[in-house]
A protein has these predicted regions:
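N-terminal accessory segment detector
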Residues: 1-295, 299-333
Length: 334
């Protein structure tokens, strides 16, 4: 069955067509399917070319969800550090060090905004080439993989940059202040993304469609799963849905390391981003939680429970217990 974009009144935005099992399949795969169904010759299946072109734009919409959060949070963490008395000189030096540490394979330091702009231009060119039949199916699929890879490299370095800044927070102010820092900068994110799940306003059952869809959409945007294409493991239980990521492309990759580029765990040198050393309520009462992963507890469980007595989702994260330990390597589960 063809995959296309449609409007969701429940969510208030355009979404991908398909049942829940289909939503667990990466948008990259769906673009490839539509391209192959369309073929290289203009004719009856021309609409499948248009479907695939629109899905390329939607791939960028998924990526945007993550890019904007990373952009807003990274700036917020830095503003918080300045408010706590860190000098601009010290902060700029640390960010510059991290940008060099996150250099691309060709040695180019991380510069997020120019990379995002270039990604948008490349994706737009791909969509136009698909629509106009200027690209064969084979050429379009090859270019799609280039777009995906460009986003993966930018995504991963942006996640690492945030993890590095959070490690700087811990070094300067101690582990307990991570919670203070997160709470200070997450409010716009909570308002935009999670206030619709306030059960004082809307019964939980009526939010399930939105909750599950935006979870799958965001994790496709993170490019989770084998080969970093955005494929998700989705299980329907009698009383709940379970989604798993192998790997989670942010915190899970921070703990495991990056097989795509052959680099090691960000807990270890040369990164040394660290993990939670003292069990706390906002770290699932566990040690070994990466600093980045703690936001999932705060945003999805702790803060919603404080405000309306009910979590948005529950999370069972991987825990650092050393390289290759099963707890480190396990799937993240929501």
């Amino acid at each position: 069955m063809a995959t296309h974009l449609e409007w969701s009144e429940a969510i208030g935005k355009r979404v991908r067509s398909g049942d829940w099992a289909d939503q667990a399949v990466s948008t990259v795969v769906k673009i490839e399917e539509e391209l192959r169904a369309a073929g290289d010759d203009f004719g009856l299946a021309a609409n499948r070319r248009e479907n695939s072109a629109q899905l390329v734009d939607y791939f960028m919409e998924e990526a945007k969800v993550v890019y904007v959060v990373y952009k807003v949070w990274t700036a917020g963490f830095q503003e918080w550090l300045i408010e706590q008395g860190v000098t601009r000189e010290d902060l700029d030096a640390e960010v510059e060090r991290l940008n060099r540490l996150m250099a691309y394979p060709d040695g180019t330091p991380l510069e997020r905004e120019p990379r995002w702009e270039a990604l948008g231009l490349r994706a737009g060119g791909l969509a136009n080439g698909i629509r106009s039949y200027d690209l064969t199916v084979a050429a379009a699929i090859d270019e799609l993989d280039g777009v995906r890879e460009d986003w993966r490299m930018l995504h991963d370095r942006s996640a690492d940059l945030m993890a590095g800044i959070l490690a700087f927070v811990v070094k300067r102010f101690g582990e307990a202040e991570l919670e203070t820092c997160y709470r200070a900068i997450m409010e716009p994110y909570l308002q935009e993304r999670y206030m619709p799940f306030d059960v004082r306003v809307t019964p939980y059952e009526e939010t399930l469609e939105r909750n599950l869809y935006i979870s799958l959409e965001a994790m496709r945007g993170h490019l989770v799963g084998p080969g970093r294409r955005g494929d998700i493991e989705l299980i329907e239980e009698e009383d709940r849905w379970v989604i798993r990521f192998d790997p989670c492309a942010s915190g899970g990759r921070i703990l495991r390391g990056d097989p795509e580029e052959g680099t090691g765990s960000r807990v270890l040198a040369p990164y040394e981003f660290g993990v939670i050393e003292e069990a706390r309520p906002w770290t699932w009462n566990e040690t070994g939680v990466c600093h980045y992963c703690a936001h999932c507890n705060l945003a999805l469980s702790t803060i919603p429970a404080e405000r309306w007595g009910h979590p948005v989702r529950t999370v069972d994260p991987p825990l650092w217990r050393g390289e290759d330990d099963p707890a480190t390597m396990r799937k993240c589960q929501w």
